[in-house]
Amino acid sequence: MTWCNDRSDVQTVERIIPSPGAAESPVASLPVSCHKTCPSCGHNFKFHEQAGIHDLPGLPAGVKFDPTDQEVLEHLEGKVRDDAKKLHPLIDEFIRTIDGENGICYTHPEKLPGVNKDGTVRHFFHRPSKAYTTGTRKRRKVHTDSDVGGETRWHKTGKTRPVLAGGRVRGYKKILVLYTNYGKQKKPEKTNWVMHQYHLGTSEEEKEGELVVSKVFYQTQPRQCGGSVAAAATAKDRPYLHGLGGGGGRHLHYHLHHNNGNGKSNGSGGTAGAGEYYHNIPAIISFNQTGIQNHLVHDSQPFIP
């Protein structure tokens, strides 16, 4: 589903009428505003061509930027291909671009714009760089003010998974976890910082200099295994457990989409939750989970990362 941005939208054109007696000169009629339709809900609203996010009336409390894996790749595709119909006019307000050859992996996540330890997700466009001038190994060492406690670096965990859309591979997703004390006598220490990195194409590895998109967050809730998921749920806020078949195994998703009182989930269209739980995962799956809490926008203010 893409953003409606074609020229067939109904437009309101302002016409300048000259004063009596003045010579009428040709004046280009410029579109002042037009009506656009949201591709998700079908709502029509008045849109000003020259307006920005600060001109919007504000977003209702509870609105969040929580794209699925497929939607993340859709935003990335619109960014790299400069497709006006795929690139949302406000996407740069929600997915910032980190310039520079070192990308995200050079900077500690705490120093990235808008990132903190409350579980909120932040998305970034960036370009991974190589660790060495030769070879294909990516740079994942994080620059810190002091390396007394050992190196800090991102470590890839699990397999690189394909993201499917329409029955075909649109790109790949890899999950990285931040570790400290690399290179010391003791075992490296795992932190709660997590990064999901996405790239387009049919190759498991991104190309050198290729634009990718990553979401970075601090995991605030511990992961649990299999049967302990249901036991951890309280009677008041019991998560929904969905069993998805895949080969001979079972894939469980733990969603924090609590009941809102009328029997419906208060979540949005994407399936987002506070954790992911796997048991005998099939070889190829399509990810839809963020793994943490979602963005929240309060006080009816526009969300600006």
From Swiss-Prot:
State the domain notes: The NAC domain includes a DNA binding domain and a dimerization domain.
Q: GO cellular component annotations, sorted alphabetically?
A: nucleus
Q: Which residues lie in coiled coils?
A: none
* Residue ranges: DNA binding: 170-225
**Gene name tied to this protein:** NAC073
Alphabetized UniProt keyword annotations: Activator, DNA-binding, Nucleus, Transcription, Transcription regulation
Query: Which InterPro entries does this one have?
Result: NAC-dom, NAC_dom_sf, SOG1-like
Q: Name one GO biological process term.
A: regulation of secondary cell wall biogenesis
Tell me the ranges covered by the NAC domain, including all copies: 59-219
In UniProt terms, what function does this protein have? Answer: Transcriptional activator that plays a regulatory role in the development of secondary cell wall fibers. Involved in the regulation of cellulose and hemicellulose biosynthetic genes as well as of genes involved in lignin polymerization and signaling. Is not a direct target of SND1.
Q: In its UniProt entry, what is this protein called?
A: NAC domain-containing protein 73
Q: Where in the cell is it found?
A: Nucleus
Which tissues is this protein detected in according to the database?
Expressed in protoxylem and elongating interfascicular fiber cells of elongating internodes, developing metaxylem cells and interfascicular fibers of non-elongating internodes and developing secondary xylem of roots.
At the top level of its lineage, which domain of life is listed?
A: Eukaryota
One annotated GO molecular function is: DNA-binding transcription factor activity
